[in-house]
């Protein structure tokens, strides 16, 4: 079963609320990372709104937190869903100039705040380029060259924009954000004056012990004061970091040659899909690295 630690969730929320109070930034809940809406009331006093990755997350945010801001980003929107999305979202971010041209006018006509996801082309990650939004050939975000080429053909695109959005981090500290902001200013700084907001995206491990809050807050202040924009952040994991547990049972133990194995009463595909997709090793209570403890054991789930 899953266990959620309400005290830890509340503490995470308090940390994020403190950042907002000290800097006047706004922090959203990225629902793709945590969408247990039974606990939204607990987090509600600490968040400015929700971030959705599509129609149904946006609807969830609207239904559960109707008084909060509702932001959405999707790599590509569906024509048959977009009108319904306008009923829920108040901030809509597009991934490409083509999507901005296709849906931006309708979003503006409906009174929505419109943004473009940018790619600052400055990677701060190593070892998993397939998930790095700044990796060569990335599908996520618009490079400056792509923007300039689109604007040359459709000069009216710039008038649709209220803000810019980037999301380049993954479980990282504020030093990576500072590096990213240098690239954002270098590539897109001339677009920021006159815009209303700048969204720093997610991947900020703000509630992790030892996270550099001072550098984060300096980064926020730097952009708000220099460009007069409202800064948003949309962490997901930071809201629920270290506040959830998967509790399972050992059903059987095996010995195959020199290898010790344990079969668990759980499904990797259903309960911990990141283990398969990433790959990812979740922290295990009282466990260590291979050879560190008296027994080294491979854990397997009971599904075939």
PLM region spans:
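A structural motif shared across PLP-dependent enzymes of the aminotransferase-like
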Residues: 5-8
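A short, N-terminal amphipathic alpha-helix
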Residues: 12-20
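Active-site-proximal beta-alpha core segment in soluble small-molecule metabolic enzymes
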Residues: 25-197, 219-222, 263
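Feature marks short, surface-exposed loop/turn motifs that line or immediately flank catalytic pockets
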Residues: 122-124, 170, 206, 239, ...
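Active-site loop ensemble at the mouth of alpha/beta enzyme cores that anchors a bound cofactor
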Residues: 128-134, 210-224, 228-288
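Glycine-rich beta-strand-to-loop/alpha-helix junction loops that act as flexible
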Residues: 168-169, 198-207, 235-237
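Conserved small/polar residues in nucleotide/adenosyl-binding loops
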Residues: 300-304
């Amino acid at each position: 079963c899953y266990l959620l630690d309400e005290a830890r969730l509340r503490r995470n929320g308090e940390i994020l609320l403190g950042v907002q109070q000290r800097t006047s930034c706004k922090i959203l809940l990225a629902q793709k990372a945590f969408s247990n809406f039974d606990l939204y009331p607990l987090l509600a006093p600490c968040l400015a709104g929700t971030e959705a990755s599509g129609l149904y997350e946006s609807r969830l945010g609207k239904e559960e937190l109707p008084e909060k801001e509702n932001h959405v980003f999707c790599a590509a929107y569906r024509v048959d869903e977009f009108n319904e999305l306008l009923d829920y979202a108040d901030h809509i971010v597009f991934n490409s100039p083509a999507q901005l041209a296709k849906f931006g006018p309708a979003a503006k006509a409906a009174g929505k705040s419109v943004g473009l996801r940018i790619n600052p082309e400055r990677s701060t990650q190593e070892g998993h380029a397939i998930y790095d939004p700044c990796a060569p050939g990335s599908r996520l975000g618009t490079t400056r060259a792509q923007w300039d080429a689109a604007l040359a053909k459709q000069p009216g695109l710039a008038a649709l924009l209220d803000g810019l959005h980037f999301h380049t981090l993954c479980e990282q500290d504020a030093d990576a954000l500072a590096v990213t902001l240098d690239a954002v200013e270098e590539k897109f700084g001339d677009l920021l004056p006159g815009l209303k907001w700048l969204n720093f995206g997610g991947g900020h491990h703000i509630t992790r012990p030892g996270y550099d809050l001072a550098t984060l807050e300096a980064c926020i202040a730097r952009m708000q004061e220099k460009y007069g924009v409202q800064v948003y952040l949309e962490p997901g994991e930071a809201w629920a970091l270290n506040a959830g547990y998967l509790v399972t049972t050992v059903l059987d133990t095996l010995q195959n040659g020199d290898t010790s194995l344990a079969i668990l009463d759980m499904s990797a595909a259903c309960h911990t899909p990141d283990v398969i997709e990433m790959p990812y090793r979740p922290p295990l209570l009282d466990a260590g690295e291979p050879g560190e403890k008296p027994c080294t054991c491979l854990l397997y789930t009971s599904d075939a």
